């Protein structure tokens, strides 16, 4: 259970960072 919780947290973290990188790329493309 502990490992599953850690994996879920890691997935959420990567998802948030991925969205941030997409936003940064979109802003760079628009500028």
Swiss-Prot record:
GO cellular component, one term: membrane
InterPro entries in UniProt: Poneritoxin
Expression sites (tissue/organ): Expressed by the venom gland.
UniProt entry tagged with the keyword Secreted: yes
Effect of residue 5 to D: In (swap)Nc3b; No or weak change in anthelmintic, insecticidal, cytotoxic and hemolytic activities, and no change in intracellular calcium concentration on neuronal and epithelial cell lines
A family per Pfam: Ponericin
Record-annotated disulphide pairs: none
Main location: secreted
GO MF annotation, one: toxin activity
Effect of residue 20 to E: No or weak change in anthelmintic, insecticidal, cytotoxic and hemolytic activities, and no change in intracellular calcium concentration on neuronal and epithelial cell lines
Outcome reported for the amino acid change (mutating residue 23 to R): Moderate increase in anthelmintic, and insecticidal activities. Gain of activity in causing an increase in intracellular calcium concentration on neuronal cell line but no change on epithelial cell lines
Subcellular location: Secreted; Target cell membrane
Keywords from the UniProt entry: Antibiotic, Antimicrobial, Membrane, Secreted, Target cell membrane, Target membrane, Toxin
Biological process terms in GO annotation: defense response to bacterium
Source domain of life: Eukaryota
General function of this protein: Membrane-perturbating peptide with a few moderate activities. It is insecticidal, since it induces reversible paralysis in insects (L.cuprina) after 1 hour, but fails to kill them. It is also antiparasitic, since it moderately inhibits the larval development of the major pathogenic nematode of ruminants (H.contortus, IC(50)=23.2 uM) and reduces the motility of adult males of the other nematode B.malayi. It does not show antibacterial activity (MIC>40 uM). It is not cytotoxic to HEK293 cells and does not induce hemolysis in human erythrocytes.
Family according to the record: Belongs to the ponericin-G family.
Protein name: M-poneritoxin-Nc3b
Organism the protein comes from: Neoponera commutata
